Amino acid sequence: MKLNRWTLAIAGTLAMTAATAQAAPPVKLAFITDMSGVYSSVDGPGGVAAINMAIHDFGGKVLGRKIELLTFDHQNKADLAAAKAKEFFSQDGADMLIAGTNSATALAMEPVANAYKRPFMVVGAGASTIVGKQCTPYTDMYAYNTTALARGTGKAIVDKGGKTWYFLTADYAFGKSLESDAAKVVEANGGKVLGQVYAPLASSDFSSYLLQAQASKAQVLGLANAGGDAVNSIKQATQFGITKTMKLAGLLLFVTDIHSIGLPSAQGLYLTTPWYWNQSPQAHAWSERFYKEMHVMPTFVQAGDYSATMTYLKAVKAAGTTDGAKVMAELHKMKVNDMFMQGGYLAPNGLMVHDMYLAQVKTPAQSKSEWDLYDLVQKIPGPDAFGPIADYGCPLAR
């Protein structure tokens, strides 16, 4: 049997197309967070589950290429996080990086992502420096930052009469950034900071720090910490009777923290959050899916992991490539409307601007179910929550 040249040409083209499709490398997403330490309940395995939910919901492929997820436990060590980020980019071919909890690790990874020109989506870390003097054209600080936390909770408590403050601060980048931002808000609204004490990350005994705070005779104890540190400091403040003379201000609290502390101890606390599992029908439906897999309601960081992943994949699809600069250009064009935020946009300094919420922890009598823990008492428009972009000091925003 003879084959004419057109048949041979078509056969050759089909063979080449099949070979190309077979050889197309996967799109690789990297995720580095605390998987086993003090912040693991905030992000950790639940963050992995949320990202995998997004990959599944997107169809498992983008640009005809399979989507793969690389994960790593940074153990809250900045040098380990930076080294693994470099390895993910240089050896494993990661196309982007999602930074989980711990600002010191995010600050260490940010210049690595910039050097490799890969999108760096910061979800769990909150230090405003990330989009300040250290900003890069590849950063997308997605969920929150210390400025927004301070402007929400700090102002609300000063407005309600909490004029004198003492800070119990986690002794690393995030805690110091949160304390600094909160102190500025307190003083700008007519309050006064009487002092601060620094506790190492993952402390178990806060008694000496709490007694120092009580001795200051401040009206408010500002907790510039998070995760297990926030839980332990609030529980111990209640046990030692600190709450009889001082009002607690949890500057970063998660739904899992309140669940762990319990409403009898946490009731009445104000907190600022970008998201709550029951804030909308869309958020509720997604959270129920997450709950079926993880058996806890998601934190805002885990919800942010899902949203950031979906947003990145949409940008890749729109750009028609995984090239970092082109994907970032698409991210800067996008308005994000999903179960996590409405009308979110990426500012020139790499900050995702969106609404935040002032919440108050319910009393046991007000709560109707195990995870019915907050009332959202005020929506804070994004520009008000995050403040003027020029104030961050990012050279890209001049």
How does the language model describe each region?
Residues 1-2, 18:
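Short terminal targeting/anchoring segments and short Lys/Arg-rich nucleic-acid-contact patches
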Residues 2-10, 23-398:
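Extracytosolic ligand-binding ectodomains
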Residues 9-18:
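Bacterial N-terminal signal peptides
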